Amino acid sequence: MSGHNKWANIKHRKMAQDAKKSKIFTKIIRELMVAAREGGTDPNTNNALRAAIERAKAANMPKDTMEKAIKKGAGELEGQSFVEALYEVYAPGGVAMLIRALTDNKNRTAQEIRHLLSKHGGNMAESGSVAWMFERKGVITVPRSEISDMDEFQLLAIDAGAEDIQDEEDPVRIITAPEEASNVKNALEENGYTASYELTYIPKNTVSVSGNDAEKLLKLLNVLEDNDDVQEVYANFEMDDSEMEALMEKMQ
């Protein structure tokens, strides 16, 4: 059984290879702008900016494009102003969702999300009714092939500030408090590991979905991620691996 993390990995891998790459760039540019505006232009002291730069590099965004986005966010260049919005949602199968958007018009974005939810079996939740089901965390990933001694690796990560290590899949995931993510990543890199990280929301508990609910849920996730204003969708579901793969192939 796998959940939202596996879905996101599959989705991002396929998007990176197809015509939707320009959409990924648009989302990352907004992320860079907002992070620079809210926390400054130094990634060493701004974890959100550092995570956005990591994401930009992973998507092979040109350095010039990154730098322009950061300067726009800091006010050094003229550009649109985006604000963060977090929407709490109930999805098919009793799944809880957080939808994180960066938008220049909150009313438009809320209207578009409501429309998508109404078409795909979801609905907006009252403020506070879903957010408590998730925790803000840093997640660092390391290719499993680089880890020759898992015990030694785990000890290194824990000493650096890791809260949990999930080594059942590839890549290995290290969970940290948001403020510790950069320290843990640095410690791993200093010891020769290739580490990338993001700031995310992790569900405290999960709901198992299958059949019709599973198909409706993945369709909803797809259309939400295709919305220009939506940066990330976090959901608390578990699904059989083979069923998830089959449904995603069906939706291509």
Swiss-Prot record:
Pfam families hit by this protein: TACO1_YebC_N (PF20772), Transcrip_reg (PF01709)
GO molecular function: DNA binding
Family matches, as SUPFAM superfamilies: YebC-like
Record keywords, A-Z: Cytoplasm, DNA-binding, Transcription, Transcription regulation
The keyword DNA-binding belongs to this UniProt entry's keyword annotation: yes
One Gene Ontology term from the biological process aspect of the record: regulation of DNA-templated transcription
Domain of life the protein comes from: Bacteria
The keyword Cytoplasm is assigned to this record: yes
Location within or outside the cell: Cytoplasm
Family: Belongs to the TACO1 family.
HAMAP family: Transcrip_reg_TACO1
The protein, known as: Probable transcriptional regulatory protein Kole_1935
Organism: Kosmotoga olearia (strain ATCC BAA-1733 / DSM 21960 / TBF 19.5.1)
